Amino acid sequence: MNRKVTAIALAAIIWATAAQGFLMFKQGRCLCIGPGMKAVKMAEIEKASVIYPSNGCDKVEVIVTMKAHKRQRCLDPRSKQARLIMQAIEKKNFLRRQNM
């Protein structure tokens, strides 16, 4: 009897853990933790992207991929460099829409 109760309790804990992880995954989350860096060397940036607020994250995130080791870094969206990157991406997207 004791083994049966233990097995049921263990199964319930495993199910609850899996269900909780699934719900967190569906909700999404921010990619950047903390305020982010003020600036990085422009020559070391391979790619930049801006992620606007959504249901999963309520803040603007500026993420740059570095040439060395393909590491990603988060920039503070209020920093001068991040604002310049966001303007450049918006201009590029605007021009792309104009050419369609």
UniProtKB/Swiss-Prot annotation:
Keywords: Chemotaxis, Cytokine, Disulfide bond, Inflammatory response, Secreted, Signal. It comes from the Eukaryota. Pfam families: IL8 (PF00048). SMART domains: SCY. PROSITE patterns: SMALL_CYTOKINES_CXC. It is found in: Secreted. One of its GO terms (cellular component) is extracellular space. GO terms for molecular function: chemokine activity; CXCR3 chemokine receptor binding. Disulfide bonds join 30-57, 32-74. The keyword Disulfide bond applies. SUPFAM superfamilies: Interleukin 8-like chemokines (SSF54117). Residues 1-21 form the signal peptide. GO terms for biological process: adenylate cyclase-activating G protein-coupled receptor signaling pathway; chemotaxis; immune response; inflammatory response; positive regulation of release of sequestered calcium ion into cytosol; regulation of cell population proliferation. Its main location: secreted. Chemotactic for interleukin-activated T-cells but not unstimulated T-cells, neutrophils or monocytes. Induces calcium release in activated T-cells. Binds to CXCR3. May play an important role in CNS diseases which involve T-cell recruitment. May play a role in skin immune responses. Interacts with TNFAIP6 (via Link domain). Belongs to the intercrine alpha (chemokine CxC) family. This is C-X-C motif chemokine 11. It comes from Mus musculus (Mouse).
